[in-house]
Amino acid sequence: MQTGGFDLLRDDVCMLSHRSDKPAIEVGSGTPDLEMVRGNFRIGDVVESRLPLDCISEINDVIRLWNKAQPELVVTLELEQSVHGSVLKLRCANPTTNRLWLTMQCSTNEAFWGGGEQMSYLKLNGRRFPFWTSEPGVGRDKTTRLTQTMDAEGLAGGDYWTTNYPQPTWLSSERHAVHLETAAYSVLDLTEQGKVGIECWSAKLDIELFDAPSLRELVTNLSDRFGRQPPLPDWAISGAIVGLKDGADTLTRFEKIASSGAAITGLWCEDWVGIRQTSFGKRLFWDWKWNAARYPDLHATIPSLAARGIRFLGYVNPYLAVDGALYQEALANSYLALRQDSDAPYAVDFGEFDAGVVDFTNLDAAHWFSERIIGREMLDFGLSGWMADFGEYLPTDIRLLDGSDPMEAHNRWPVLWAKVNADAIASRGKTHDATFFMRAGFSGVQAHCPLLWAGDQCVDFTRHDGINTVITAALSSGLVGNAYHHSDLGGYTSLHGVVRTSELMHRWIDLAAFAPVMRSHEGNRPADNLQLDSSPEILAHFARMSRVHAQLAPYVRALSEEAVATGLPLQRPVFLHYDDPAYYDIQDQYLYGADMIVAPVVEQGQTSRLVILPEGEWVHLWTGTVHGKGTHNVAAPHGQPPVFTRKDSTHTYLFTSIRQAFGS
């Protein structure tokens, strides 16, 4: 502690400097000003007070801070050691204080990454990132007409920072990381060079600090902290999962796709529960059990597919349609979250229909959902996997059984939802055989969710909501401990004339083949959009790349084993293995494990693209041509996206076999 202040040092480098005449910590009070429309939020804050803490004392290693005009408002600060690193604990007992602001220091050339699953920017410098789980929006670029239209239609345009999975954790190029252990709304502000601004809507905050000799070891430390995922099942990585939602015609179409020679290990029918038609498109009937009218023979179809090595996957989310039977069951058992102004169940508007919220703070309700719905209606029925959708919509004016503040429960909800799903699988002893995938997340979801998907991209090449965002999402989420990531092949959102093109389908097929899981989706408006079976060319291309994906399975299995041991993600930024500032901004290509670089075409109209190769000798997967370090212009025809493998890889035999089977 210095006279009139204190410094927080990391390896003799100052991270936080607080002085009476230049306070780095402020406290205050505020009232949230929020509006939610179907998971899209307008977030404002009415700040009623903001006080710099200009008085300092220390008693028994506890620093006390206050403002000279309000000495009764005291903030205590303690530095403790944890198994993972150091923890800076800030507390203010004043009941009216609910805001904290801190300004930490950094070097002017320090780079930052993380923030959960970020769609627009891998490197966070120069921008402000609120952490609040929500719909990411459609368009996500305030300069575009689509975003402006969606904003006008229900706050649904989004922005560069909106994401299903925020996490207040960031990594530094100086090989340290910071995590805010809070579920409250918080903000990372990197708009001012040399400063790291933190805002937290709570008077209680733990700032966890991590250090490591390398960036890879830092990622391992974060994975140790937040939890590891189990290995993906063999069937999930050994072929494509075909998504169809065409009711009685699904199996006919599936057999056509299967007869193309595609390597298929899964059939995913999210409409297994039935359909509800809305102006947005085909929606599902949210009563989570087999709909015999939609799929009359599904109970016989599932074992028949299994005999061919094809698993069946479905869909579930944490809400119950008010006109469904399971809603009535939950209501009868008092398992639903309530309104604040009455004991009536809270009804959430999901766009032309309402649904109830199962209260996962009620342990009996959480167990009921795990056992009664996922266990009995899904796993026992024969499902091997599912999309565990949503988790971002918890209203902030809801009443929960545990009495928790919904402003904080909101961010915790995806984690509770993930645990409900994981518990169901564990209860059947199928943790290594069944799987589910989620788009929503927050700190701690890593311990429960085995597989992320990138959410609802637009079916286009746009900068902030198109195919390219899938790569950024995989890389950013991987840095904070999520080893497995994939996307909806073809994209999802088709609105206001935005529809899939043949070029987009071909490029997404190429991209999906080089992810741990290759899964297609028909999108929100299947009839308006190209599908896998819409043309012989698309189907043949899908069949080819599904076989490439299947042939890569031994390599993916090795990466999965590495992920279990170290927490390293399968898709990695180049800088994770080659710590060079020249690579800190790269977000349109990635290392697939240490031995492969994948550079998909994610811009419209390209027939080639620039690929940055780090040091070493790199073999072009399709031709065998050897390239060295540097930037190379590489041809990128459909079916041969720019992919390179390390010449000295222990997997060279496998890579050579792929070239012999699919190369030119």
Task: Enumerate the language-model features and the residues they cover.
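Catalytic and substrate-binding clefts that recognize carbohydrates or anionic sugar/phosphate headgroups
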Residues: 1-234, 241-243, 247-249, 254-259, ...
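Conserved, mostly hydrophobic/aromatic
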Residues: 90, 169, 257, 305, ...
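Generic recognition of stable, solvent-exposed alpha-helical segments in well-folded globular domains
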Residues: 164, 213-217, 221, 245-252, ...
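Aromatic-lined carbohydrate-binding/catalytic grooves of carbohydrate-active enzymes
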Residues: 231-402
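Aromatic-lined carbohydrate-recognition surfaces of secreted/lumenal glycan-active proteins
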Residues: 237-243, 268-270, 310-323, 387-388, ...
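Alpha-amylase-like alpha-glycosidases and glucanotransferases acting on alpha-linked glucans and related
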Residues: 338-383, 418-458, 520-541
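Catalytic core of carbohydrate-active enzymes
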Residues: 424-428, 433-434, 440-454, 477-487, ...
